[in-house]
Amino acid sequence: MTKFETVRGMKDYIGIDAEKIRYLESIFRDLAIKYGYSEIITPVVEEFKLFALKGGEELRETMYVFKDKADRELSLRPEITPSVARAYIQNLQSSPKPIRLFYFGTVYRYDEPQYGRYREFRQAGIEMIGDSSILADLEVLDLLYNFYDKLNLSNDIIIKINNIGIFRKIMDKYNIEDNLQEHILHLIDKNKINEALDILEKNLKNKDIIDFFNKILTKKDTKLEDIESLAELEEVSRLDIKSEFLYLFRLSRILSNLNIKFKIDLGFVRGLAYYTGLIFEVLHPSVQFSIAGGGRYDKLIELYGGLPSPAIGFAIGVERTLLVIKDLKVEEPVNVIVIGMSEDTIPSMFMVSRILRKEEYKVVINTKDQPLSKLLPYYASQGFKVAIIIGKQELEKNMITVRNLITRKQISVPLENIEDAIKQTL
């Protein structure tokens, strides 16, 4: 007989594990709505080129790619930002700016499965399109920080930030092609600094610039005053990147005033190739990987054929975030089992269940043909707190019996008093 199991790198989530995911989703959704964001749901399947165009080397190598019956090259989405950008061009380009969108969905990457890395996983994220101001960047970071604050993680996390515009501007100034820029940044992201510097040396042929690159790439934890000092260096002015350092200084100073924990890492690069300015990741001391990340991508929408539109966003790794939460208590409704003692009680069983479900109780109707002496301990062992028992005598008097399955306290009351009776027994 054939035995089917989950595909490698993918996982079933059942009961409390599924509820934890939905709980995180509800926290994120409520917060995003309070910040003025509207939900967007995009397809899991998109054209391969949508992601391949600016996804970066690593992403392209891990995509699930296939051809459909019309010979179109398609992909399961490895992330959601490009889908939102495509949907914006297709549906929202003429709408008033900025556009604020949030999403929650599964993504797929053919990575080697390991702790904190899956081939199917969930992302919760936002995108703000049509605003290039520092206020937009701060709003996005504030929302991200507040999400983790609601999970009681704000004292543990730190947001690592950098401005990838520093690297971009230098390479643009010396006419390094986009594909080569992408490769250099990929090497830096993988901590292959020497390889990246070798390529830069071959293309720039300028030792001073290579030395400057090396200098900033090794500044892993830069203080605010260091950024201000760097902005005043002669070589920074010569390379026309003073504004990029001053932006980082302004942003960092305001983040400090907002009591958001962060660190500046001038050697930090993210793997996705579309970032143009601010980049950031959320780190937690209990794991070796980031649990969320994002940045500014001011050229992606134009690259996709839309009008020039600055944009910024982030994605939260849902499963990764759950890994760092020690005690996530999901509030559950009271579990109620409704037991009828004869066929005549069936209509009353359903009527009682309807009443209780309207009041947010979790209600199950008993379908087992067993004596009450076996049913009550069984349902108590399954986590039910209350049993509603409807027998022949109760039915004749329009009464029900409410029993606390933990304390075994029970009372008989008229049907209309069922809610008060449950509260009395709990």
UniProtKB/Swiss-Prot annotation:
InterPro entries assigned: aa-tRNA-synth_II, aa-tRNA-synth_II/BPL/LPL, Anticodon-bd, Anticodon-bd_dom_sf, His-tRNA-ligase, HisRS-like_core, HisRS/HisZ, HisZ
Compartment(s) where it occurs, according to its Swiss-Prot or TrEMBL record: Cytoplasm
Similarity field: Belongs to the class-II aminoacyl-tRNA synthetase family.
GO cellular component term of the entry, any: cytoplasm
Family annotation (CDD domains): HisRS-like_core
Protein keywords: Aminoacyl-tRNA synthetase, ATP-binding, Cytoplasm, Ligase, Nucleotide-binding, Protein biosynthesis
EC number: 6.1.1.21
Gene Ontology annotations of biological process type: histidyl-tRNA aminoacylation; L-histidine biosynthetic process
Keyword Protein biosynthesis annotated: yes
Keyword Transmembrane recorded: no
Reaction(s) this enzyme catalyzes, per UniProt: tRNA(His) + L-histidine + ATP = L-histidyl-tRNA(His) + AMP + diphosphate + H(+)
Gene: hisS
Pfam families associated with the record: HGTP_anticodon (PF03129), tRNA-synt_His (PF13393)
Protein name: Histidine--tRNA ligase
MF (Gene Ontology): ATP binding; histidine-tRNA ligase activity
SUPFAM superfamilies associated with the record: Class II aaRS ABD-related, Class II aaRS and biotin synthetases
UniProt-listed PROSITE patterns: AA_TRNA_LIGASE_II (PS50862)
Domain of life: Archaea
